[in-house]
Amino acid sequence: MKGALGSPVAAAGAAMQESFGCVVANRFHQLLDDESDPFDILREAERRRQQQLQRKRRDEAAAAAGAGPRGGRSPAGASGHRAGAGGRRESQKERKSLPAPVAQRPDSPGGGLQAPGQKRTPRRGEQQGWNDSRGPEGMLERAERRSYREYRPYETERQADFTAEKFPDEKPGDRFDRDRPLRGRGGPRGGMRGRGRGGPGNRVFDAFDQRGKREFERYGGNDKIAVRTEDNMGGCGVRTWGSGKDTSDVEPTAPMEEPTVVEESQGTPEEESPAKVPELEVEEETQVQEMTLDEWKNLQEQTRPKPEFNIRKPESTVPSKAVVIHKSKYRDDMVKDDYEDDSHVFRKPANDITSQLEINFGNLPRPGRGARGGTRGGRGRIRRAENYGPRAEVVMQDVAPNPDDPEDFPALS
């Protein structure tokens, strides 16, 4: 027992039992993460890499600018270069807060060359004239552009530019639709696309909303559908297109026509009766048209023309010019006998000899029990031969000729 436990095979088995396990981690759990977008992750990594490159270039540019002359600079610019010359890195919060005072005072004294870290974000109007051939300053301006995820101030500027003076004849509903953000026209996510060609930032000022803003719901009865009102007013339904003016304009035309008809009727009293009769007929026709399905079917059956067939009838009279070609083969007495006999209903020809013949049906012998199988034993066949013997002779005696009779066997000579 001890030897068995001390063997290397047992030790290996014990080690396998201790190290045995099952990995149950789900390797597809990353596919269930629907909140994060892989493209956003890639863009974020690219943005971080660009920021690192921009910081490196900005530090190099600050060091190169600090070594040059410092005369004719604004206090803000001097402080900025002094901080850069000291070797201390500017934080992202300071970079965002510094462009504000510089933007408020663009005409500051001695504002010839500003600090490279204090460049503000270019505006829409300035972006078209932006030149890339300005050396390190152009690179810094490109570095200071905000990422696509950050909030963009041109949305608020657009709302401030569109004032009531620009839309003097708008309605409250139009103002509500105008204040709403545009759907599908870019925004904080896709605003940077195509801005180099005067993209959505410039197109907003050319045409405010190119979709039409549901103008089809605000048309009542104007010139765009005037033809449609004339066509549909004859129905006089609830949903006919048109306004109250159209109905008021159409209705007075009918009363104006009635007095003319009355004057004509007064001028010609003799023509009153013919004029009234067609009106009564029209009323009757309208009443007849209102009927049920059964009444309509009955009316159709009555008005339907009946088919007339030319049916040829057999002639019962014998023509006078008829000639007997040959006499009938049937006899009258045979026909009478057939009618008298109940068992025969068919006619018999004159040369029928079936009634004169005597037909006898012989009784076949019952087969023996042994012959039921056919192949069993031989007793059945023997009995059958014995039974057939005498009966066959009796039958043959009636039919076979007599050799001694000269009538049956006449002489050959």
From Swiss-Prot:
The modification Phosphothreonine is found at T354, T375. Residues 42-206, 227-320, 360-413 are annotated as: Disordered. GO terms for cellular component: Cajal body; cytoplasm; cytoplasmic stress granule; cytosol; extracellular region; Gemini of Cajal bodies; nuclear membrane; nuclear speck. It is found in: Nucleus; Cytoplasm; Cytoplasm, Stress granule; Cytoplasm, Sarcoplasm. The modification Omega-N-methylarginine is found at R70. Keywords: Coiled coil, Cytoplasm, Isopeptide bond, Methylation, mRNA processing, mRNA splicing, Nucleus, Phosphoprotein, RNA-binding, Transcription, Transcription regulation, Translation regulation, Ubl conjugation. Residues 184-201 have a biased composition (Gly residues). GO terms for molecular function: ribosome binding; RNA binding; SUMO binding; translation elongation factor binding. Pfam families: HABP4_PAI-RBP1, IHABP4_N. Residues 87-97, 139-182, 294-315 have a biased composition (Basic and acidic residues). SMART domains: HABP4_PAI-RBP1 (SM01233). Residues 404-413 have a biased composition (Acidic residues). Highly expressed in brain, heart, and kidney, and moderately expressed in skeletal muscle. Also expressed in a variety of tumor cell lines and in activated but not resting leukocytes. Methylated. Methylation is decreased by phorbol 12-myristate 13-acetate (PMA)-activated PKC, in vitro. Residues 62-82 have a biased composition (Low complexity). Associates with ribosomes; promoting ribosome stabilization. Interacts with EEF2/eEF2; promoting ribosome stabilization. Interacts with FMR1. Interacts with FXR1 and FXR2. Interacts with CHD3 (via C-terminus). Interacts (via C-terminus) with RACK1. Interacts with p53/TP53. Interacts (via N-terminus) with SRSF9; this interaction is direct. Interacts with SYNCRIP; this interaction is direct. Interacts with MEF2C (via N-terminus); this interaction decreases DNA-binding activity of MEF2C in myocardial cells in response to mechanical stress. Interacts with PRMT1 (via N-terminus). Ribosome-binding protein that promotes ribosome hibernation, a process during which ribosomes are stabilized in an inactive state and preserved from proteasomal degradation. Acts via its association with EEF2/eEF2 factor at the A-site of the ribosome, promoting ribosome stabilization in an inactive state compatible with storage. Plays a key role in ribosome hibernation in the mature oocyte by promoting ribosome stabilization. Ribosomes, which are produced in large quantities during oogenesis, are stored and translationally repressed in the oocyte and early embryo. Belongs to the SERBP1-HABP4 family. This is Intracellular hyaluronan-binding protein 4. It comes from Homo sapiens (Human).
